[in-house]
Amino acid sequence: MTKQTGRLTLPTDADIVEETIRLKNLLGADALRDCDGTEMPDALLNEPVKKYATYYTTRKDNAWAEQNPEEIQQEYLISNRVTARSEKLCIRLMEGFHTQQLKVNTLDDPKRWWEVIDRTTGEVVSVDDWEFKKEREEVEIKTIPYHEYTVSFLAFLIWDPVHMYNFITNDWKDTPHQLTYDVRQPKTQKYVKEKLKRWCEENPQIDVVRFTTFFHQFTLTFDDKKREKFVEWFGYSASVSPVSYTHLRAHETSAH
């Protein structure tokens, strides 16, 4: 009886090379792949099967992100609801969020891109009635006593959410936090295209490229205790920015 192979892909890692080969032969796997946070071991590159390689379009290049901090990926956050007890209220923006994952965007004008809402009346508070205190990362609001208020604001994703999830779940210790970058931004878009082309040319042994971590797929936002605070598996919550909003509005205007 002829031994059949195919339709089975085995994940692998650097410390299970021999076991991977044994299972490949035993189960008749026709492909091997690396996993998130790992790379295909060199010892497996000559195995007579297809090779799948994970490729990250929006992370795993901290040098680029550090050189272009204004093009790091962003998302909108909403502060805690806070009740005013006088005619002035200060809301701490990052309270309840993990500061290793998120950083307040102080580069773009808060009065243009943020919103303060009186949750008791449902009305948007005039930009003349609040100020952002950059050094304290607080918003100071002229308030009506005993009304509830929130602030919606932009924050940079300074730790990729999927990498953070894997870091916490797998209890990684010494792995550097991976920064994000936004492929809609002009410099990053050009850089990412050139980098992908170069990677394909330098890795002819790879048969299938597994693209992963697209920010339009899901959102993972963690609280200050590294617990999942907000999770959305189908949406665009973590792929917003002034640039993307401006492009969207321009497209809507031209469509009409």
Give the positions of each predicted feature.
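Conserved, mostly hydrophobic/aromatic
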Residues: V209
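Short catalytic/ligand-binding loop motif for oxyanion handling, primarily in non-cytosolic enzymes
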Residues: K60-W64, H216-T221
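Short secondary-structure boundary/capping segments
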Residues: P48, P69-E70, D223-E232
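Conserved small/polar residues in nucleotide/adenosyl-binding loops
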Residues: T246-T253
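Mature N-terminal, pre-catalytic/accessory segment of carbohydrate-active enzymes
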Residues: M1-R198, E202-I206
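Short, solvent-exposed loop/turn segments at secondary-structure junctions
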Residues: T38-E39, F214-Q217
